[in-house]
Amino acid sequence: MPSQRKSPDQKRPRRSLSTSKTAKSQCHSITSYFNSAPPAKLACSTCHKMVPRYDLIRHLDESCANNGVGDDVQVEPAQAGLMSPTVPTSDLPSGPLENVTPQKLSPPKRSLISVQCGSKLGIQQQTSPYFKDALVSKDQNELPNQSVEIMPLGSLTSKLSRRYLNAKKSLAKNEGLASQCPQTSPSTPGTSLTDNCPEMEDKDEVLNSSQKENIYSCAPLKEENASEQKVKNNKITGDESQKASCGEPALTPASAEHASILLSSDSTLVSNTKSSPGDTLVKQESARRADVGLAEPLEVRSHKEVQMTFDAAAKTLVSGEAESNGPTDVDMSDMTTWSNNQELVREAGSVLHCPLEQGSSCGGPSETAQLALSHPYYLRSFLVVLQALLGNEEDMKLFDEQEKAIITRFYQLSASGQKLYVRLFQRKLTWIKMSKLEYEEIASDLTPVVEELKDSGFLQTESELQELSDVLELLSAPELKALAKTFHLVSPGGQKQQLVDAFHKLAKQRSVCTWGKTQPGIRAVILKRAKDLAGRSLRVCKGPRAVFARILLLFSLTDSMEDEEAACGGQGQLSTVLLVNLGRMEFPQYTICRKTQIFRDREDLIRYAAAAHMLSDISAAMASGNWEDAKELARSAKRDWEQLKSHPSLRYHEALPPFLRCFTVGWIYTRISSRAVEVLERLHMYEEAVKELENLLSQKIYCPDSRGRWWDRLALNLHQHLKRLEEAIRCIREGLADPHVRTGHRLSLYQRAVRLRESPSCRKYKHLFSRLPEVAVGDVKHVTITGRLCPQHGMGKSVFVMESGDGANPTTVLCSVEELALGYYRQSGFDQGIHGEGSTFSTLCGLLLWDIIFMDGIPDVFRNAYQASPLDLLTDSFFASREQALEARLQLIHSAPAESLRAWVGEAWQAQQGRVASLVSWDRFTSLQQAQDLVSCLGGPVLSGVCRRLAADFRHCRGGLPDLVVWNSQSHHCKLVEVKGPSDRLSCKQMIWLYELQKLGADVEVCHVVAVGAKSKGLG
């Protein structure tokens, strides 16, 4: 276009906008309205300089003399009046906003702060520098001198949205507590910081009505009884009933208010689940100091229990609350209370300290706060992980001095060096061309940063690239083709892998000129020319990378229980920290109690990390269909495991509870062997698969929850593939006698035994079926409907054609078999329906049992600040450790009327909405009203029965629940439906759940969908 080819100075002037008679008489086409060229330069709204139109944003971010005013808004205490004793408390909003639902994705609103707080609290309104009228000046010399903060270009709106939060943190931490609380001194241990800051609580409630626990708040502690209750709720005082919280006797829900509810028949099930501002203050400070390294190193006592020791500031903080109960000693030997919300890691970057020598990029506390705020999200997350390790003495013992020196060198890197290393660390461990590195937010020229990382031992450059396979992988396909032409390779136009194979074949050939011993070989010539073609390249050094990978593995240890990919070193945990940092993820509030040491020494952790990486490689090979590679990896892992079976550390692992034993090397190698069975079956190597299964079943220490699947696969291989009928029958008998064989696998073994017993070929083995335990499952109601099947090619779920809309405007839509069934039941009078399978019931169970799931007093089930469930949720110890509380709650649910069920679900929903929990899917229901309608239709007996089965054996019972839940909102009639499409049948777990639900009194049925042709709709 002409506007693009001409410079702004050469463009024609703006057309006249005059509405004179002459102009009106002219008739123009519509294109004339788009020919007015914009001005070449615009006046900056801040400094009033004439700036090129295309450089206005860059000028505002980098060059404008007054942009510091908008970036870093300094609110003086005298101006704000937040903590001034002259401000009357009657003008402040009073009362906690307890009924406000926390919003997971809602950041603090600037308009709310400006309107509500500016008038009452005297806070200067935070206005973007682009719209500050106070800065308008016609004389450039009149502009005040402002400090200019150089910020990397990025999302401008994201920078603006964080400015008020950063200014507020700076006020609260650096100015507010020091200037407005002068009475507090180390000589007065009975006075806390909160006694002199009564206004902060009301200020906090106004600023963060929906997530008030996320901001540092100071609640007044004038009433002795109130402060005592708050301290007891947070387990801070030395109360005798709470000192054994990590021992066996004390079992309390996460809130003290729940303790009296468990054994009472009161209609209030979950009362005041959200912590008060005073509670949150102590919880949040505990978590912040533990998570980012402000606390002193953790001490491991003789009973191997982790103790959190607060620094002087923290002791002053809790001294006023502890005074009401007696002496000022605060017993934190049993547990440390963590408030897991998104603000903790968000504030972590501003309080990170570098406990290292001079020369580090983090100079001191004041410099650290300013520097960390400028760090990008990925570096802040990485530093949070490092500080969590440095603050835990038990974890620090798992690294030797050389590895600690690597951490020290990382802190000594410049800010750009740290950023680049974290970026490269998160990428795949392979060689990277320097020309492919583009991180403008780090530096426009990365060469000095790369040299710094190389000198510090974190990077390798092309001088150390000596493997031909690595350099060939580094080249692109066109570069490989060009290189192939120079060596006259046949078919240089092939695929990249074919060219790589051709080069490897050429490199193995012997040189024709055998008399020249000093002449380089063919491999060396290929390597040199390939490196010249690739140019400068680099790779992260394996040694330091392995150290940081182990740190991440320790930090994300609890995630690897279900997430197969978490075995790759905890890379995904950085994403979790990032989401928490951005306020997009919030975890429940629970108490961390680390009593048992999992890894005895450094070598134990290294062995576990090696096994975890092997499991990750095997899983990746299986996912890509490389079964031969997976088989070789599994055989290599088996050899390593055979050498470790006599190691003395295994005896220590055997004594661990199952929910901690899963973090041992033996457990990982057992999972690898279980994967090897699937690989061998895929390759039709059934003899080897049977031997592997027999080895797995010969031990009962590792992976006991998988024994049902192992017995089932062994019986299938012996019966179907190897035709060893007698061995198959004996296998079934032993499997049915195994107490670890549960639910679906138990029924599957029994059904196979029945088929074998009725088979004519097994008549001579009838004596083996004597005393076979019977597994009885009753049948339920079945209905059949028809649906027009949409023609499709390939495998996959069936797609049906369904009529939608009213009679006047009918439409044809494509739907799944479950959606087709929902339409059928909608026509049958059920106006509400959900296709959620097990998530529907687990969400209701999680809401009704929330405080018991996250209750205090059970050691080692919560070990870090990023857990969505206790570690023992998938084991039998979950119900056993909480039996008294669960039995009382289940009886309460069983006899509760519909109004109480609705109220309990509503209270838990409003108090916990958005927090990440394994059982709860917040998007399963369209609203709280829909969830309340469903619980009132299901009733107490059905809900208590479902909750009991899920709590007793969540691992084996979470699957198999009905697909649909439909109900009539007027008659409160509810139906649970399992939908089966063409050529689909019920699984064993589904049969058991339907039978159990029917026994509980629920209306259940199986809806079979029979397909008919769709040619009448013209879709053939």
From Swiss-Prot:
Residues 180-195, 269-278 have a biased composition (Polar residues). Binds 2 magnesium or manganese ions per subunit. Ubiquitinated and degraded during mitotic exit by the APC/C-Cdh1 complex. One of its GO terms (cellular component) is nucleus. Zn(2+) binds at C44, C47, H59, C64. Its main location: nucleus. Keywords: Coiled coil, DNA damage, DNA repair, Endonuclease, Exonuclease, Hydrolase, Magnesium, Manganese, Metal-binding, Nuclease, Nucleus, Ubl conjugation, Zinc, Zinc-finger. Mn(2+) 2 binds at E837, D963. Residues 1-11, 224-242 have a biased composition (Basic and acidic residues). Mn(2+) 1 binds at D963, E978, V979. Interacts with FANCD2 (when monoubiquitinated). Interacts with FANCI, MLH1, MLH3 and PMS2. Nuclease required for the repair of DNA interstrand cross-links (ICL) recruited at sites of DNA damage by monoubiquitinated FANCD2. Specifically involved in repair of ICL-induced DNA breaks by being required for efficient homologous recombination, probably in the resolution of homologous recombination intermediates. Not involved in DNA double-strand breaks resection. Acts as a 5'-3' exonuclease that anchors at a cut end of DNA and cleaves DNA successively at every third nucleotide, allowing to excise an ICL from one strand through flanking incisions. This is Fanconi-associated nuclease 1. The lineage of its organism: Eukaryota, Metazoa, Chordata, Craniata, Vertebrata. The gene is Fan1.
